[in-house]
């Protein structure tokens, strides 16, 4: 059962202190408004004390406050005041916790069993910058940030349509992370929207810190080598997918948006395809397909050719392979597996290590691979 706020200001302050466990960043200040005892509560770093004081003092100096009791003061601040802080009522501690951790300020008045939250958010966030994982030659240089509302504005600025819809959900019993669902009401299939709403409303996760946490719960289920959910950190690409009838899911704290559904061929698309001529974009896409199938099939095809149909190989290459087989104790199949395994290790090291060390590892690996290719006659 939810704990309701009390008429006693002291009891409400003690309940909030107990709720947040005497956290040092939880700020409370006793003030007097029209001779009535009040208290403001906020989290340092999430709310702006300066903005709150400027707005309240400016309004108090401009407006005559003619109130005689706590209920009158509460109703005046809620409905009659010109304070531009979007005041909203709060009746229980769980609501107060949700609003406070979102960066708002809670105003408590002695003698009133309700609180008043005001929009004083002042969170520090990374500015909009160029995405590092999705480069392009032409087009926008903007990337998503970690703040959900900023990401909403980036999409809304690109898709200025009356059919663009943005819905929010809350996931994670411990983190209470806000999730945004963006779609075009005229283009997105209703069946897809019903499925996404049902799954986002009932996520069995105690913690949600990134959009990747949602991926296993949004797919159709069953085994598949390729995911049916894509990701992007570019607002223009997310806007393009929305205009194609897909849904985009954003998570507060993550610069990566999820795109549902995601088809296999979309892994080979880029934003440059939209700004290039059709035949040139198709040619580049065919090159990507060819590179993918070569990387996947060539090692196995080479092992099969050497082991079962060596007459398909050029004699010079066959002689070098035979000489290399004599010098190594492992069969060609195991050699190929070891090489692929080492390549994955080098790739992970280049990605996860600090940039200074990762670049050095990648350079050394490239030199070793190049030297091995020359010695093999390739």
Q: Residue spans of the language-model regions?
A:
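Transmembrane alpha-helical segments that form the functional core of multipass membrane systems
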Residues: 249, 256, 262-378
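Membrane-embedded alpha-helical signal segments
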Residues: 1-297, 311-315
């Amino acid at each position: 059962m939810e704990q309701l706020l009390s008429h006693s200001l002291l009891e409400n302050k003690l309940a909030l202190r107990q709720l947040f466990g005497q956290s040092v960043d939880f700020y409370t200040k006793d003030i007097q408004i029209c001779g009535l005892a009040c208290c403001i509560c906020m989290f340092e770093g999430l709310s702006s004390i300066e903005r709150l004081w400027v707005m309240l003092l400016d309004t108090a100096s401009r407006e005559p406050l003619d109130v005689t009791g706590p209920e009158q003061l509460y109703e005046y601040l809620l409905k009659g005041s010109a304070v531009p802080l979007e005041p909203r009522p709060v009746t229980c501690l769980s609501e107060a916790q949700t609003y406070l951790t979102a960066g708002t300020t809670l105003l408590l008045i002695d003698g009133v069993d309700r609180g008043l939250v005001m929009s004083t958010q002042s969170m520090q966030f990374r500015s909009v910058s160029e995405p590092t994982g999705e480069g392009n030659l032409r087009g926008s240089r903007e990337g998503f940030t970690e703040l959900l509302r900023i990401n909403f504005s980036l999409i809304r600025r690109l898709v200025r349509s009356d059919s663009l819809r943005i819905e929010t959900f809350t996931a994670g019993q411990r983190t209470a992370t806000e999730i945004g669902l963006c779609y075009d009401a005229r283009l997105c299939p209703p069946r897809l929207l019903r499925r996404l709403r049902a799954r986002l409303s009932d996520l069995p996760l105690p913690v949600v810190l990134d959009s990747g946490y949602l991926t296993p719960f949004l797919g159709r289920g069953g085994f598949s080598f390729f995911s049916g959910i894509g990701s992007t950190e570019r607002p223009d690409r997310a806007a393009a997918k929305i205009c194609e009838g897909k849904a985009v899911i954003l998570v507060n704290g993550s610069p990566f948006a999820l795109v549902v559904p995601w088809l296999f061929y979309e892994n080979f698309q880029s934003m440059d395809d939209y700004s290039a001529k059709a035949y040139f974009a198709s040619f580049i896409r065919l090159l990507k397909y060819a590179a993918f199938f070569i990387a996947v099939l060539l090692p196995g095809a080479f092992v099969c050719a050497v082991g079962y149909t060596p007459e398909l190989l050029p004699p010079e290459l066959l002689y070098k392979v035979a000489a290399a087989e004599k010098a190594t104790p492992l069969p060609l199949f195991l050699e190929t597996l070891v090489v692929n395994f080492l390549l994955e290790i080098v790739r992970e090291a280049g990605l996860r290590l600090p940039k200074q060390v990762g670049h050095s590892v990648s350079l050394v690996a490239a030199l070793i691979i190049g030297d091995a290719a020359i010695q093999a006659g390739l």
